[in-house]
């Protein structure tokens, strides 16, 4: 009993430590000032979410028509409603400005939490390496508009952050959770991923499908998970697909240089990673430390970056996934007892 109590207290202390670090960096004291957040594209989301809360939700709508700009425009037909829904519920307790800022901050906290969860050896034991990896990931500053890190929230990429976090949690519950309903829970997170942003959903769907098909699970649980996913995403996805012809082409010029994929703050990590792979290759092969998931993130990002057709996906958006794969791989190699995502 003493050993269990000691481990529990240690686990709680570690969680509190990383939570305090996040709070200090995220300036929660400013979050609770009742003002209107601005900065970059984030400020442009305020009108949309305000309209969503005042006009759509009271009428049980997730999209509709807004008269806030020129002759009006369709709102949330082509963008992702879940962050606005989260803000709506926060706004039941807090003023709009505070609710909006809490929603943005929660996206960063969830990204760190999801990375930490994926790095756990067991479902209930916090991973120090995972929490450190999560903090490092969100504090990278070599890109500011692609999503996933703290700097990108000012570009309105909190939606991407939510989607990435939910994608990670869907993989965690699919592979590592001991919950009897891990398949339905995983499908809820996958649906939340899609309802937050499309790009992480596209990147994670192939590896999720592979794990989903390869896992031995009660057939009814799998049917239930599919039903839950479709029930959650069908309404918004149907309106998106039916009106897809009206979407605009952003006409981004794709990157072609390797330095646009490998940013300066991740480059030292890659050198360290290469050194560790060379030094520990025998142990890595023996212990089977390397897993499909992080290798998939790295190599799919590289392949899509150089070979994705122009216009299908702006290849700059692959940088967050490449960085995440590198950070995952480095963290796993540092762990003396291998942490397997497929355990």
Sequence positions of predicted segments:
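Membrane-embedded transmembrane-helix bundle of lipid-linked glycan/lipid transferases
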Residues: 2-336, 340
